[in-house]
Amino acid sequence: MNFQIADFTRLIPEFLLLAIAAMVLLGDVLTRWSKGKEALNDRTEEAISMTLMGLGLAFVMVLIQGGFFSWMQFGDWKFYDFSIFQNLRSSGLDGSILGGAFVVDPLTHIGRLVFIGAAFVTVILTSKAKPSNNPAEFYALILFATLGMIFMTAGGELIMIYLGIELTSIPLYVLAGYFRRNPVSTEAGAKYYIFGALSSAILLFGMSLLLGLTLMNGQTMTTTPTSLRSVATAVELAFANPEGPSQGVAILALLFILAGMAYKVAIVPFHAWSPDVYQGAPTSMTAFISTASKTAGFFLLYRVLVTGFGAPSILGTAAIGTSTSFGGWTSLIAILAALTMLVGNLAALPQTNAKRMLAYSSIAQAGFLMLGLVGTQRDSGISLLMYLIAYTVTNLSAFGILALVEDAVGGTDFSNLNGLGRRAPGLALLLTVAILSLAGIPPLSGFFVKFYVFIAAWQEGAKWLVIFAVSNTVISLYYYLRFLKAVYFAPAETDEPIKVGFGPGIVMTAITLLIFGLGIVPTWLYGVLEQATIRIAAQ
């Protein structure tokens, strides 16, 4: 793995996140000698400010580096023009650096923006429910997890992918159980760690099989044996010779990798950890885990499946871009998608806790997301990426508002939401928009991305799955509407107004406007996502 000077400039956002995390920790060390509650508050505010500043700077750097800004000439003046229709080219034709281990392509830029944005919102949400001790470690862990998610999305070879998964997972295990005086939070962290460690072991075993497959097929002569390109060549050779043992190894490796990743994104039957962890973790961290972490998992799954296992000979179908590609492992994805939608929706129906219900809702949403993986056509990839972005924004809004309600009333049961429409009309309106978007009600983003993913899956030939998904959408309306019943029609124990801080209120309002924007004018995102799918299909 060769590191060149040009690679440094392409990794500036990652170096920024690492530097800010180090500065947050160092700054806390220099002020830790101060005692008392006031000194702790000062340390926390400093950590929050530095983290937000670093995330904001990294976000702007990604915009500039990704080609979202371009110089425009106006007479004798030059100025920056914000343009998201640029063809993102920041790392050459093949988009890979560090010997192909890190891929800088449109998908990486999109992932950077999504993860950094989600981390920024999460830090804002924690500004009221601050950690009671060691604040610097808390916010540094958020930065490290964000960095790991970027590595997951940009990983072009198996070792980098695994390092990204662990760099994401380990900080999240700690953050889920960070409030040690709360036994529910501690239990959530322990369960998350146990299930996560098991999934990492399963995933690592699948990767070891892929490494053996590439070595078995002699792929070390021209490329790194752990690169996804080597994996793709070795798997294609294995399927070209069905009489040999290589095909069985390739299938077994794929099954282990799917199982390991299914744990990470809570796909049935590997979903059991999700409700307990989501309910027990601090609500602000639940928002981060359920959105950014799951999105990173799906980004990784998309890259690995399309790049490593997307050859027509593996699918047993026509070439990409010429006909449907529904077959082979995509049939397994379709079955898992159907099970995930059904189990998630049915389990959500009897829930009395809003966080736990949204946890099962997130499982069902993972099933809908998997419709974008039932084929390798370009439209399937675009619909998946659009759904992921809309899901991240919407779920972040829903859990974020629950975090604000919990700070005010001390719980997240449906009884705690009773009368919210009278106690905090603005907050109730924002929650309503998020819930209706999750339910797929037009003109919100949730409706349009579901429509796109249904159309793409139908074109791939998975007609039965689309019909099943539409039926599950109808089922989900029941438990989503329970939110509105509690917010607007259930009597509250008190009519005391709920006050929300200026910062969290502005951020939640901005996210709600984005939910509308992605729904009313979804085409503005299409061009960037199209470039992402083109580059991945070409790798």
UniProtKB/Swiss-Prot annotation:
Q: Which GO terms describe its molecular function?
A: NADH dehydrogenase (ubiquinone) activity; NADH:ubiquinone reductase (non-electrogenic) activity; quinone binding
Q: How does it sit in the membrane?
A: Multi-pass membrane protein
One GO BP annotation of this record: ATP synthesis coupled electron transport
Tell me which stretches of the chain form a coiled coil.
none
Q: Which reaction does it catalyse?
A: a quinone + NADH + 5 H(+)(in) = a quinol + NAD(+) + 4 H(+)(out)
Q: Name one GO cellular component term.
A: plasma membrane
Q: Where in the cell is it found?
A: Cell membrane
Q: What is its EC number?
A: 7.1.1.-
Q: Which Pfam families match?
A: Proton_antipo_M
The record's annotation in InterPro entries points to: NADH-Q_OxRdtase_suN/2 (IPR010096), ND/Mrp_TM (IPR001750)
Keywords from the named record = Cell membrane, Membrane, NAD, Quinone, Translocase, Transmembrane, Transmembrane helix, Transport, Ubiquinone
Family annotation (NCBIfam families): NDH_I_N
Give a short account of what the protein does.
Answer: NDH-1 shuttles electrons from NADH, via FMN and iron-sulfur (Fe-S) centers, to quinones in the respiratory chain. The immediate electron acceptor for the enzyme in this species is believed to be ubiquinone. Couples the redox reaction to proton translocation (for every two electrons transferred, four hydrogen ions are translocated across the cytoplasmic membrane), and thus conserves the redox energy in a proton gradient.
Entry similarity comment: Belongs to the complex I subunit 2 family.
**What assembly does the database describe for this protein?**
NDH-1 is composed of 14 different subunits. Subunits NuoA, H, J, K, L, M, N constitute the membrane sector of the complex.
Task: State the name under which the record lists this protein.
Answer: NADH-quinone oxidoreductase subunit N 2
Question: Gene of origin?
Answer: nuoN2
